[in-house]
């Protein structure tokens, strides 16, 4: 699930990304409320203009990521963000934690994030993530 375009606010981006997952049958309202509750408790800004909103607890039957790339950064709490990964990890699946390995590489690698921003398409995002997978495993 992928969005490229402008966004008025943090809450709007979260809602759009959640709605994409909802329309695919991957999310329900309980997940959305858990994500928003988590946002109210702590920031999901991770540095390098990247935010990773996620629920307080694992609620999904399937792991998924919804991605937004924003041509103009938006304020995310006290920082600016132009890439958002809404992440939900499958409950009761210890292998699903591998997803955080990919994301931690992205967070710490500014070059990779710049590659994604340079060509903000789903195809390029898939290519970059595939390369991360090859490099890590």
Q: What feature does the model see in each segment?
A:
Residues 1-137:
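Cytosolic covalent-transfer regions centered on His/Cys nucleophiles
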């Amino acid at each position: 699930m992928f969005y490229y375009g402008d966004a008025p606010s943090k809450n709007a981006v979260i809602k759009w990304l959640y709605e994409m997952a909802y329309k695919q049958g991957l999310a329900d309202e309980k997940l959305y409320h858990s994500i928003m509750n988590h946002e109210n408790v702590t920031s999901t800004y991770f540095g390098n203009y990247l935010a990773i909103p996620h629920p307080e607890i694992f609620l999904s039957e399937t792991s998924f990521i919804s991605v937004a790339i924003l041509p103009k950064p938006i304020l995310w709490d006290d920082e600016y963000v132009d890439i958002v990964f809404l992440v939900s990890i499958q409950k009761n699946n210890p292998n699903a934690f591998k997803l955080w390995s990919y994301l931690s590489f992205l967070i710490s690698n500014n070059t990779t994030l710049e590659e994604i921003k340079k060509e903000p398409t789903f195809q390029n995002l898939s290519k970059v993530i595939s390369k991360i997978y090859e490099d890590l495993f």
